[in-house]
Structures are given as C-alpha cells and as structure tokens.
Design a protein with these regions (language model features):
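A detector of single, family-specific signature residues
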Residues: 1-183
C-alpha cells in the first residue's frame, strides 16, 4: 500500500490502562499502516488493533464481504433448525480474532454514553449475556472491516440518538398495530 504511507496523523491515541505495549509512536505506525484511525471505533485501541492485525493480517481480500469476515471470526448467529426441529449443537467457538472482538464488546457492556452498549444491554434483558456480547462483537467486527477495506471512519451516534431511534421505531410499531386492529 504505497499510497497510504504519507498519511498525516492528527488524532491522539486512546490511553491503555493495563499491559500497555512498550512501543513508542504505536498510534502513528498504526494509522500509517492502513490510513484509517481505528481508535475512532468504540472499544478498540491501538494495542487491540495490533493484536487484530496479528490474527487477520493486513490483506483483507480473502473476505469478499463483511458477512464472510464476521463468519470467519465466529460472530454470526448459528441457527441449526429445519422445519420445527431445532438441533442440539455444542457451542461453536470463535477464533482468536473473534475472541478479541468479544473482549472489546464486554468492555462496552456497561458504558453510559455508547450506543453499542445500550444495544447489548437491551439484548441482554431479552436473551442472555453471552448472546448480547456476541452481537456487540459482531457490530465491532463490521466497523473494523469497513474501516480497513473501505476506509470508512466509524462515527459513534451516541446513546441519546440511539434511544430516539428506538422510540420512533416503537411508536411506528404501535401505529401499525392500531391500524391492524382498527383502533
């Protein structure tokens, strides 16, 4: 990627609290590698990005779409059902990259101002903690894939906007239900 070597680094890195790597200017190296600031994705920092590059490599051409990437990470929901019969399948484990995304998602579970955290808490109430963490990890993996392959920066929409969208969705659902029952 010769065109991306001249990228100017203007952002500051996220702080790493525990087990910080002893690499000076890691943030600048990471941004110059792909030309995208991965630190804009909630839950991911430079060290996490370094670990993910170690697992996935720098060439993402082996994954044609985001669905192929999330499936390779082991973050897609598994539905072993035919007709009305659900098969009993032992838990399918993630690979190391999927586990890294799960660790990042678990850190966002109790976040106050991040939309992915709100999404996971809502899902945790309906399903299970493990399912919520896996779904949040899938969202992080999708944002990572889009940042690496397409250069799309992740923009955190925030908790208030997420809750407004949920409220609008709920109102439209109630309106449809009222029309259906002719109320």
């Amino acid at each position: 990627m010769p065109g991306k070597a001249n990228v100017e680094v203007t952002s500051t890195p996220k702080p790493i609290r525990h087990h910080a790597p002893k690499i000076t200017d890691l943030h600048q190296m990471v941004v110059k590698l792909h030309g995208v600031n991965i630190g804009s994705i909630s839950g991911l920092n430079d060290y996490t990005f370094l670990r993910l590059i170690g697992e996935t490599g720098t060439d993402m051409n082996r994954f044609p779409t985001v669905k192929h990437f999330t499936n390779w990470c082991g973050l897609t929901p598994q539905n072993h059902q035919t007709g009305k019969v659900k098969k009993r399948v032992e838990g399918i484990s993630c690979n190391k990259a999927g586990q890294i995304f799960k660790e990042c998602a678990q850190g966002l579970l109790n976040s106050k101002y991040i939309a992915i955290g709100s999404f996971m808490r809502k899902l945790k109430g309906r399903k299970d903690v493990a399912i919520a963490i896996k779904a949040g990890a899938k969202k992080l993996a999708e944002a990572y894939y889009n940042a690496i392959t397409k250069g799309i920066d992740y923009v955190e929409q925030g908790l208030k906007k997420h809750e407004q969208q949920l409220k609008i969705q709920e109102v439209s659902m109630l309106n449809r239900s009222a029309k259906k029952h002719k109320i």
